[in-house]
């Protein structure tokens, strides 16, 4: 299953929805590893095709190239924002970005108002010149009379009279200075008000909180997935039913086919033979038929669905169930209840688990003649029963602490796995 996903680099959205957050993180990590591996293969093939090593390639004139910075481990140097003690917190960065945006917006508004003010001042100057010309024309006769009177009074000595031009220039400078101060004060007040509105906006605050919570959750899940991956990598083969990942899964010798299974009856109902009972089957799609054929041909020889030391079907085993049906079966149980069902989407299994928060679903990879949770292929089990026994004491994930405590059995008859064993 994992091999198929990595070869196609695609996972069905419905199948992805069944994965837990931890399995999603591990799957994305695996897919990224596969992308890097393919990229390296293509680069090596291209270098061989060009038959020139990378270092000895002739450089073009004025050619540009990119060189990645390498860390102490000789790998590409990566800086994860927010994890270094010198990095600014997320909310501080948001505040600085918003303040910078509002400052730029206020500067643009100030330039626009300055241009409008300059245009208005120019229009006032034109009007003032027109008024002055009209006043000069009207006062020309009076100036002639005043000039004659001034010539007669030359004997009395010169007299300093303030001109109207000096008063006008002084008044104009004061007005311009006052307008400039008012404009600057208005810009500062507007910038502060816009920034205050942004800070007090409830929708923005809610969006910021959600973004921070999502970042924290992703960081926590990624960290937890890495810890689980490392923890399971260090275990190796440490008990019955486990396989060493370094040497690869050893293909077991197929045992003889088990006898006809002893079907478990629903709780509270008397034993009833199913030998002569007619079973009403619904029409199945080609995908479901392929899954049934796969189970009979490839899984029955490995005693899939059987209890570990008997020929009885395990109480936690179910047939092809939908996600909705699995949730309904678990809804009547208590936290720690679980069941393993044949997936309706792929050739594999899904473990449905009831926790305090609700139902969780983990895909089980059965593609390598062994059983392991999707992505965590370092710890593989020879049978489904071994996987269940192991996780009765060892949690599936360190974060969720999922222990398989109470198997969820059949609630209807005939059992939902009947078509798999016929």
Curated annotation (Swiss-Prot):
GO terms for cellular component: cytoplasm; cytosol. Coiled coil: none annotated. Residues 163-190, 212-231 have a biased composition (Basic and acidic residues). It is found in: Cytoplasm. Residues 141-190, 202-282 are annotated as: Disordered. Keywords: Cytoplasm, Phosphoprotein, SH2 domain. InterPro entries: SH2, SH2_dom_sf. GO terms for molecular function: phosphatase binding. The modification Phosphoserine is found at residues 117, 123, 233. Its main location: cytoplasm. Residues 316-408 form the SH2 domain. SMART domains: SH2 (SM00252). Inhibits estrogen-induced cell proliferation by competing with PLCG for binding to ESR1, blocking the effect of estrogen on PLCG and repressing estrogen-induced proliferation. May play a role in T-cell development and function. Interacts with ESR1. This is SH2 domain-containing protein 4A. It comes from Rattus norvegicus. The gene is Sh2d4a.
């Amino acid at each position: 299953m994992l091999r198929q996903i990595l070869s196609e680099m695609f996972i069905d959205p419905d199948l992805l929805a069944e994965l837990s957050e931890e399995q999603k993180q591990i799957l994305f990590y695996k897919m990224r590893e596969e992308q890097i591996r393919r990229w390296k293969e293509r680069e090596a093939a291209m270098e061989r095709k060009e038959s020139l090593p990378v270092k000895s390639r002739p450089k073009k004139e004025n050619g540009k190239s990119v060189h990645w910075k390498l860390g102490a481990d000789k790998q590409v140097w990566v800086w994860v924002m927010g994890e270094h003690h010198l990095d600014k917190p997320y909310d501080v960065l948001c505040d600085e970005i918003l303040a910078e945006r509002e400052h730029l917006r206020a500067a643009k508004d100030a330039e626009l108002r300055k241009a409008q003010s300059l245009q208005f001042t120019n229009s006032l100057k034109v009007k003032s010149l027109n008024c002055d010309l009209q006043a000069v024309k009207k006062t020309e006769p009076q100036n002639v009379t005043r000039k004659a009177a001034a010539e007669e009074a030359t004997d009395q000595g010169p007299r300093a009279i303030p001109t109207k031009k000096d008063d006008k220039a002084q008044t104009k400078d004061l007005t311009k200075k006052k307008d400039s101060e008012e404009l600057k004060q208005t810009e500062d007040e507007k910038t502060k008000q816009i920034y205050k509105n942004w800070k007090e906006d409830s929708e923005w605050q809610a969006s910021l909180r959600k973004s921070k919570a999502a970042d924290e959750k992703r960081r926590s899940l990624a960290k937890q997935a890495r810890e689980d991956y490392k923890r399971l990598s260090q275990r190796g083969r440490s008990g019955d039913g486990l396989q060493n990942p370094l040497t690869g899964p050893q293909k077991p010798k197929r045992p003889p086919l088990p006898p006809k299974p002893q079907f478990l009856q629903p709780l509270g109902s008397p034993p009833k033979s199913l030998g002569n009972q007619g079973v009403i089957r619904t029409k199945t799609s080609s995908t479901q038929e392929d899954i049934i054929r796969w189970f009979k041909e490839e899984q029955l020889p490995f005693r899939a669905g059987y209890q570990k030391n008997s020929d009885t079907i395990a109480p936690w085993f179910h047939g092809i169930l939908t996600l909705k049906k699995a949730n309904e079966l678990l809804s009547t149980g208590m936290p720690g209840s679980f069941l393993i069902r044949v997936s309706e989407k792929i050739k594999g299994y899904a473990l449905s688990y009831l926790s305090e928060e609700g139902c969780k679903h983990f895909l089980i990879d059965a593609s390598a003649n062994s059983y392991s949770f999707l992505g965590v292929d370092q710890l593989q089990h020879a049978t489904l029963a071994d996987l269940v026994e192991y996780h009765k004491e060892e949690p599936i994930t360190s974060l969720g602490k999922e222990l398989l405590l109470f198997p969820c059995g059949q609630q209807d008859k005939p059992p939902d796995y009947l078509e798999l064993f016929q």
